[in-house]
Amino acid sequence: PTLSWAVRDLGCSGGICMTASHNPAPYNGYKAYGPDGCQITSQAAAAISAAIAGTDAFTGVKSMDFDGAVASGKVKWIEDAVLERYYDAVLAQSVNNLSDEQIAAAPLKLVYTPLNGTGLVPVTTVLARAGVSDVTVVPEQEQPDGNFPTCPYPNPEIREAMQKGIDLCEQVHPD
């Protein structure tokens, strides 16, 4: 969601996310986003495919050194300031209307698993800023790993993918 949001925030023509997603490892790759921050439609993908098919791979492809593309502004990294705005935007959508004192008086205890994806830093950052400091992370699924060694189909909608998190819940008894 960070890149999708950043495409709109930065006014980009599009974005590409190299991803491990929440799909099995053979489906890892990239996701292309349009200027609206949404993944491109099948129509847009077909138009891109047609343009690629109509291009001579030896003479019709424009190329640029990566460092030169960065220096010219054609390639942009998502910088910390963009991430900070993203975290602020996520927090602004929060339904939490409790004061800091109320949060401190009734702390929330959570178990979280990023399923070997990239959610650890943004999720724990937003939770901490919302006053949630007691977060136990599933250790085997904490670090990003596109091979997903702990669950072959790391989609949180599939119960088996969440089994390690469920097991940890039974040990630490979160709220």
Task: Report residues per predicted region.
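Gly/Ser/Thr-enriched, mixed-charge loops and adjacent short helices
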Residues: N28-L168, V172
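Short, high-confidence coil segments that cap the C-terminus of an alpha-helix
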Residues: G11-S13, V172-D175
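Ferredoxin-reductase
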Residues: P1-C38
